[in-house]
């Protein structure tokens, strides 16, 4: 078994177990899934509802003025401004973005020093902003003149009264945590606790207090003991009521003068106006809502044609809920992970989820409803999932592989889409496997099995067809037969055999081809390729950033490039566009600002272990406010009872501020308790929470090499994934016989439909079989070795037939019946039995109904039965209590052959009474044999000359129901010319099949023989008490092949060893297993040197045939074992009364698979190289896949014909019916031909079918056997 096959088998088994679990516990699983959906959708409260998201409009900063209150736009003219952009905004928001770091980093600094000193500078900045005054010709303006004045907070916000400003300008900064008091800040021993003490314990959906005061998302602030970059970011938020360009420009120039950012490239060119809606926009919801309505309607109208679905509305609603929940879970999880998707109808993501979810729903529905309806609900769900497991996982792996490759392209747009796709695929898979599968099991469970008439053929379950000229598919032409003898239920092609509606054809086409998902995957690959080809800078930018960040030199050690004058202007006439203020003088290199103290030399040399973190400014810093919650600004204004519904605010360009702090300031600002904290300074060798920089050129080279190794590893991983993906596509798209000549799909189309569009149906023929008559009662045991056929009826008569010609070779009557050894007498007895059996039918048989039997001329007719016997009624005595007790014999005496008088018999001698009655009646006395005691030893040789039977008695040809002390025959086996018989008395007999003589026998024991195995020279007898006896058969002369009459048939095996009448046969007891089972043994098989027993104690045991050593005890059934199969390949199959079938590995004793097969006992079981065929008391024949344990199809038999099956070859199955046999193609489940066995056999069902080696079939019709040869058309087909 290859790796792919093993993986496929593991996946199939896992899905099968999952299906059983979902169908067994539906309510808990649905509740658990509902809780998971609610938990994953809870973060959606952070997002706006569809259509309620903020709307933006951008205008240039230069020459900006608030729009008028009324729009002067004329109707019909194009207008670039939105309708809501009228009048002044509620407020103008100015953010001062601060990035601060301690540089250079001292090795003795603590983790808290990363953010304590940078946060302390926020108080200084707030003072500078409040003290800023603009003096011009129009007068003096301060912050109080232009800012938004607020009053009291809402009454319910008492906890925030000391944190948010009241009765003054709305100005927010991290200093608000300490009431803008620097002394409070320095006295605070735990800054982290102070910041997070107002955070909610649960997941907060609106803007938190930390986000409001810091102005940036929490993960970008850097205020954490676990940060890896020693960089702190926060904003000081100013809210203005009026727009004053000069005041804002002077404030920007002053801050950039005091805290310059030399490498800043932020553009201050535009204002962003953000409008907030109040109600849901119905117009934007229409496309998405329409899509889901169409999905609901399509699934409903499609499932109306599926009879196996109880509630069409419920299933359609469950599909819509599954798809919608998958979408909401995906967006909720993405929000929880930090992504902020939108649910606007214009996004493509919701529609992709709809397409993928719909296709998965159709796949699961089609797979489950295609399972056999006679199975339990949980088995149908398990088989449906198992059959589609490989396809589901294969598509899932392919999609994840494409997403993984797309993510490693490092293009931001592709990476964002890949993150969404991964979350969407996982959530959709989760809901399909748990929610929809469980709902589908509940719906199918509601379909009561009583509502489905299993006896009706499939065409009876269809709605009445419209009158058309041509008959519909699977509608058979009228025949002379009243009804079909079977009903077949195919799993893979059950719906293909019917004329499907077009809507179901579309569903099954989408489910079979998975067209939508493959198109999406192909489109994703093309889109990723186009983006990578057109924007390859994503990878280069990433690599350059990695090398720059880990460079030991940085930008400070690089020599300044000579730049011509005029290329990079140092200032701009407009202060808003100037990098440096007009009055700022250029500082010499490595010189601090005038107000900044010089760095002490003692700390500047040899005390830092990492370079200064590079403070960089990128385009993403211009709009960092976009990463805040959409409820950030509405929440802030709502605290002061100001609503933003149907109004807008204007965000001014960000003012960048860079703060570089030296280690002395960090040490001076440290709290006394920080030194005793549990956070020691990082060591140079540690790579845990901190980024340790290189210490020398060697370390720098190692870091640079490590970056290259990372890139190489990513490339290697992408290459491996791509190769595996191509290999999987090759395995999927190319068949196994790819490239082989003549390996086309034409053979599979042969016989796919039992009745095609042209009205072709499998042929029905009638032949005259060879009828084997000779039994008065029903035949109980059948055995054959290919050339000979042995049958035994309930009366105890054994007949030996020639399997080629159908002639009766020998009859072995019941031991209590007198027997004539002459041939003529045997023929007369045959004719008497024939006359008796024919007379029992109520009338003479019509000529031509059955072929005449070949026989010799018979003698004079015998007298009537019991005519020569006297009336023994007077000898009957019912007073048993008055009878004297006979003493038991002290020792058993040897048994002699029939026909010899027993000497010193211990039983009562009735001969005197019988002789007296004969004399009174005037009849001649007869010889009455006495009972034979059992023989004493395990070895039982009998010479041929001792085989004298009863004396000839032609006047009494048949005593069918004479009493016998030997017991009835319970088991029968045939090999060569020897017949082994096991009787209810526990006696084992070996008979000559040709001569009809008893060759040897064993002693009688108290337990009868329930099963026999006759293999080579070994005989194994299983007894009613659970014991096993191993016998060895020996002859005094060499065994010679038996010369059979007639040419050997096709496929016949070499003749089994036989012995002539002159050989002495001895049967030795070699081994005995006294307690093989606790209860009676019901099944016994042997092959490949192994003996397998099955018992009513629910277990199987595997013995070694040569020494009777028990190898394994197999437990897996919950009922008694009824049938066992084993072949030369060590494959063992067992069936029990629990209706289950187990496949075992005889080499290891492990159970390979367990299948719930029938509603009742499993009556027969056989295997081919690829299939397992079982039958049960429910008159159902099931065909299973041998490797996966999946049910392929089932055949409903006539009442009483459930066990009548046989395998002619690996591709041909024969089943019995009411007077007929049917031939099936095992590969496709197609009915090839039905053969009726004449008029006489129509009234009785075929109870048993035995396939001979010469392509002949023996059918058991009660007291008669029919020998049928396989039709020639099937021989050519096979």
From Swiss-Prot:
Ubiquitinated at Lys-454 and Lys-466. RNF145 triggers ubiquitination of SCAP, likely inhibiting SCAP-SREBP complex transport to the Golgi apparatus and the subsequent processing/maturation of SREBF2/SREBP2. The modification Phosphoserine is found at residues 821, 837, 850, 905, 935. Residues 46-284 are annotated as: Loop-1. The chain crosses the membrane at residues 19-39, 280-300, 313-333, 345-365, 402-422, 424-444, 519-539, 708-728. Residues 60-80, 581-618, 668-696, 834-904 are annotated as: Disordered. Residues 40-279, 334-344, 423, 540-707 are lumenal. Residues 1-18, 301-312, 366-401, 445-518, 729-1278 are cytoplasmic. Gene3D superfamilies: YVTN repeat-like/Quinoprotein amine dehydrogenase (2.130.10.10). Pfam families: Beta-prop_SCAP (PF24017), SCAP_N (PF24006), Sterol-sensing (PF12349). It is found in: Endoplasmic reticulum membrane; Golgi apparatus membrane; Cytoplasmic vesicle, COPII-coated vesicle membrane. GO terms for molecular function: sterol binding. It comes from the Eukaryota. It is a multi-pass membrane protein. The modification Omega-N-methylarginine is found at residue 1050. Residues 535-710 are annotated as: Loop-7. Residues 731-1278 are annotated as: Interaction with SREBF2. Loop-1 binds to loop-7, enabling interaction with COPII-coated vesicles. When levels of cholesterol in the endoplasmic reticulum increase, Loop-1 binds to cholesterol instead, thereby disrupting direct binding between the two loops and preventing the SCAP-SREBP complex from exiting the endoplasmic reticulum. Escort protein required for cholesterol as well as lipid homeostasis. Regulates export of the SCAP-SREBP complex from the endoplasmic reticulum to the Golgi upon low cholesterol, thereby regulating the processing of sterol regulatory element-binding proteins (SREBPs) SREBF1/SREBP1 and SREBF2/SREBP2. At high sterol concentrations, formation of a ternary complex with INSIG (INSIG1 or INSIG2) leads to mask the ER export signal in SCAP, promoting retention of the complex in the endoplasmic reticulum. PANTHER family: STEROL REGULATORY ELEMENT-BINDING PROTEIN CLEAVAGE-ACTIVATING PROTEIN. This is Sterol regulatory element-binding protein cleavage-activating protein. It comes from Bos taurus.
């Amino acid at each position: 078994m290859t790796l792919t096959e093993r993986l496929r088998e593991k996946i199939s088994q896992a899905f099968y177990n999952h299906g059983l679990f979902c169908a067994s516990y539906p309510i808990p699983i649905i509740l658990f899934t509902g809780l998971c959906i609610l938990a994953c959708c809870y973060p959606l409260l952070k997002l706006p509802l569809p259509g309620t998201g903020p709307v933006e409009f951008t205008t240039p900063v230069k020459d900006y003025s608030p729009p008028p209150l009324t729009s002067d736009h004329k109707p019909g003219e194009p207008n670039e401004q939105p309708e809501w952009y009228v009048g002044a905004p509620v407020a103008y928001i100015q953010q001062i973005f601060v990035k601060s770091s301690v540089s250079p980093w001292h090795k003795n600094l603590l983790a808290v020093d990363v953010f304590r000193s940078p946060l302390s500078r926020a108080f200084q900045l707030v003072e500078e902003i409040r003290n800023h005054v603009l003096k011009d010709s129009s007068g003096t303006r301060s912050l109080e003149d232009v800012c938004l004045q607020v009053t009291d907070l809402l009454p319910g916000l008492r906890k925030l009264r000391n944190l948010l400003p009241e009765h003054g300008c709305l100005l927010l900064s991290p200093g608000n945590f300490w009431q803008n008091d620097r002394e409070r800040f320095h006295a605070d021993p735990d800054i982290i606790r102070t910041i997070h003490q107002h955070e909610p314990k649960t997941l907060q959906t609106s803007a938190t207090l930390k986000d409001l005061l810091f102005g940036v998302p929490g993960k970008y602030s850097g205020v954490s003991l676990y940060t890896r970059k020693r960089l702190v970011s926060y904003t000081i938020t100013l809210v203005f009521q009026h727009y004053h360009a000069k005041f804002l420009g002077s404030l920007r120039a002053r801050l950039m003068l005091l805290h310059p950012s030399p490498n800043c490239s932020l553009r201050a060119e535009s204002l962003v106006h953000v409008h907030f809606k109040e109600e849901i926009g119905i117009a934007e919801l229409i496309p998405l809502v329409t899509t889901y309505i169409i999905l609901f309607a399509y699934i409903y109208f499609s499932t109306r044609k599926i009879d196996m679905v109880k509630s069409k509305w419920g299933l359609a609603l469950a599909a819509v809920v599954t798809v919608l929940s998958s979408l909401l879970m995906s967006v909720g999880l993405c929000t929880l992970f930090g992504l902020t998707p939108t649910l606007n109808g214009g996004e493509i993501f919701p529609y992709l989820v709809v397409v993928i979810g719909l296709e998965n729903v159709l796949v699961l529905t089609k797979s489950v409803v295609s399972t056999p309806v006679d199975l339990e609900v949980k088995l149908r769900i398990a088989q449906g999932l198992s059959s589609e497991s490989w396809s589901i996982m294969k598509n899932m792996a392919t999609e994840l592989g494409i997403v993984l490759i797309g993510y490693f392209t490092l293009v931001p747009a592709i990476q964002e889409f890949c993150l969404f796709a991964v979350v969407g695929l996982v959530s959709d898979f989760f809901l399909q496997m748990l929610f929809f599968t469980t709902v589908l099991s509940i719906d199918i469970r509601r379909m009561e099995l009583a509502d489905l008439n299993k006896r009706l053929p499939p065409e009876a379950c269809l709605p009445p067809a419209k009158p058309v000229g041509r008959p519909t598919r699977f509608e058979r032409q009228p025949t002379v037969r009243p009804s079909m003898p079977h009903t077949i239920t195919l799993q893979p092609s059950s719906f293909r055999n019917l004329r499907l509606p077009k809507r179901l054809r579309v569903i099954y086409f989408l489910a079979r081809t998975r067209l939508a998902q493959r198109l999406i995957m192909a489109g994703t690959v093309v889109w990723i390729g186009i983006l990578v080809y057109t924007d390859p800078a994503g990878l280069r930018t990433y690599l350059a950033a990695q090398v720059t960040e880990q460079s030991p030199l940085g930008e400070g050690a690089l020599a300044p490039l000579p730049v011509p004058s005029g290329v990079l202007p140092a200032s701009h006439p407009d202060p808003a566009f100037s990098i440096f203020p007009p009055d700022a003088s250029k500082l010499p290199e490595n010189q601090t600002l005038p107000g900044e103290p010089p760095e002490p030399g003692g700390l500047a040399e040899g005390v830092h272990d990492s370079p200064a973190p590079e403070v960089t400014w990128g385009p993403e810093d211009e709009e960092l406010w976009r990463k805040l919650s959409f409820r950030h600004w509405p929440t802030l204004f709502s605290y002061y009872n100001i609503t933003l519904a149907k109004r807008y605010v204007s965000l001014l360009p960000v003012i960048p501020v860079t703060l570089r702090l030296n280690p002395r300031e960090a040490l001076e600002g440290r709290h006394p308790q920080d030194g005793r904290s549990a956070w020691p300074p990082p060591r140079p060798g540690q790579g845990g929470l901190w980024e340790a920089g290189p210490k020398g050129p060697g370390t720098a080279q190692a870091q640079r090499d490590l970056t290259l190794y990372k890139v190489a590893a990513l490339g290697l991983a992408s290459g491996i994934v791509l190769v595996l993906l191509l290999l999987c596509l090759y395995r999927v798209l190319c068949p196994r016989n790819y490239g082989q000549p003549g390996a086309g799909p034409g053979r599979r189309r042969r016989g796919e439909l039992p009745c095609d569009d042209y009205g072709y149906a499998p042929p029905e023929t009638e032949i005259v079989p060879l009828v084997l008559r000779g039994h008065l009662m029903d035949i109980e045991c059948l055995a054959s070795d290919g050339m000979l056929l042995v049958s035994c009826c309930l009366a105890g008569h054994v007949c030996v037939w020639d399997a080629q010609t159908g002639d009766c070779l020998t009859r072995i009557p019941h031991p209590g019946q007198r027997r004539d050894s002459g041939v003529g007498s045997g023929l007369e007895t045959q004719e008497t039995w024939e006359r008796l059996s024919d007379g029992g039918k109520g009338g003479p048989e019509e000529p031509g109904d059955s072929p005449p039997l070949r026989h010799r001329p018979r003698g004079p007719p015998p007298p009537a039965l019991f005519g020569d016997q006297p009336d023994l009624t007077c000898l009957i005595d019912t007073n048993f209590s008055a009878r004297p007790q006979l003493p038991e014999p002290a020792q058993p005496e040897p048994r002699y052959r029939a026909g010899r008088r027993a000497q010193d018999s211990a039983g009562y001698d009735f001969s005197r009474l019988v002789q007296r009655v004969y004399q009174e009646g005037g009849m001649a006395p007869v010889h009455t044999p006495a009972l034979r005691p059992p023989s004493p030893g395990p070895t039982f040789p009998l010479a041929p000359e001792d085989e004298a039977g009863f004396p000839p008695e032609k006047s009494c040809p048949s005593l069918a129901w004479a009493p016998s002390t030997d017991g009835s025959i319970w088991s029968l086996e045939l090999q060569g010319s020897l017949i082994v018989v096991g009787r209810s008395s526990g006696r084992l007999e070996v008979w000559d099949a040709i001569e009809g003589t008893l060759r040897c026998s064993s002693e009688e024991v108290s337990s009868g023989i329930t099963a026999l195995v006759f293999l080579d020279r070994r005989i194994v007898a299983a007894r009613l008490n659970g014991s096993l006896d191993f016998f060895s058969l020996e002859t005094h002369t060499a065994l010679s092949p038996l010369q059979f009459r007639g040419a050997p048939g096709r496929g016949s095996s070499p003749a089994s060893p036989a012995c002539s009448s002159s050989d002495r046969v001895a049967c030795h007891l070699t081994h005995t297993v006294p307690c093989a089972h606790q209860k009676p043994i019901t099944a016994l098989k042997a092959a490949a040197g192994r003996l397998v027993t099955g018992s009513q104690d629910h277990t199987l045991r595997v013995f070694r045939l040569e020494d009777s050593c028990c190898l394994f005890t197999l437990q897996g059934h919950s009922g008694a074992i009824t049938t066992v199969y084993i072949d030369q390949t060590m494959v063992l199959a067992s069936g029990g009364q629990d209706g289950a079938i187990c496949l075992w590995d005889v080499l290891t004793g492990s159970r390979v698979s367990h299948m719930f097969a029938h509603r009742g006992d499993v009556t027969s079981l056989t295997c081919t190289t690829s299939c397992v065929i079982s039958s049960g008391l429910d008159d159902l024949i099931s065909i299973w896949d041998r490797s996966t344990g999946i049910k392929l199809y089932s055949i409903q038999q006539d009442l009483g014909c459930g066990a009548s099956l046989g395998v002619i070859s690996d591709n041909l199955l024969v089943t019995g019916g009411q007077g007929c046999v049917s031939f099936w193609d095992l590969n496709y489940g197609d009915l090839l031909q039905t053969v009726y066995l004449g008029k006489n056999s129509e009234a009785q069902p075929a109870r048993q079918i035995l396939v001979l080696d010469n392509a002949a079939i023996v059918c058991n019709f009660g007291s008669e056997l029919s020998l049928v040869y396989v039709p020639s058309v099937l021989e050519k087909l096979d």
